[in-house]
Amino acid sequence: MNSRLLALAVAVTLPVLNPSLVLSADTKEKAAAVSEEDGKFFDAEGTPTFKIENGTVDWYTFSGYRRYHSDCHVCHGPDGVGSSYAPALAESMKNMDYPTFLSIVAEGRQNVGGGKENVMPAFGDNKNVYCYLDDIYIYLRARAVDAAPRGRPPNKADKPQGAKDYEASCMGG
């Protein structure tokens, strides 16, 4: 059996043998904040998430909105709705886990198929993106599970000291 067929057989068989390897779609329930550390919220699995109450978003969701619209919306469309040459992240994030998101943004990705080529550039060296990966992830996760509507969040929590300290450290300030 050649290596390509073997890889395909493994990819098809592993989820059958171990159903936990199949990533199920994210939902508001899975994304619910169960813990908080200096203004950053986490779900039951310890993955960064959002907290939106009475129309007020946590700082990281708001920051993610700002950072997304600074660097990502040019290709992926406003509010993650996609464009003619980049996928709708508000849709694809429903089935993308946190490590995969971090890897794709940091390292980039190239998809070629059906006569079409899509290239996601690597942003691992761009501090304006890399220093805010959690924020962008949190914002897109909120959009993916319909917790955050389109447009600028009307109200936001204050910027926590932990966010200020991390930003200064990451940006070199």
Question: Can you describe what each PLM-predicted range is?
Answer:
Residues 69, 73, 77, 94, ...:
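Sec-exported extracytoplasmic/periplasmic mature domains
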Residues 22-27:
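Boundary at the C-terminal end of the N-terminal hydrophobic targeting segment
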Residues 80-107, 119-126:
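Gly/Gly-Pro-rich "capping" loops immediately C-terminal to redox-active cysteine motifs
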Residues 28-50, 58, 115-173:
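Flexible coil segments in periplasmic/lumen-exposed cytochrome c-class electron-transfer proteins
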Residues 59, 63, 67, 84, ...:
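Extracytoplasmic/secreted proteins, especially bacterial periplasmic and envelope-associated proteins
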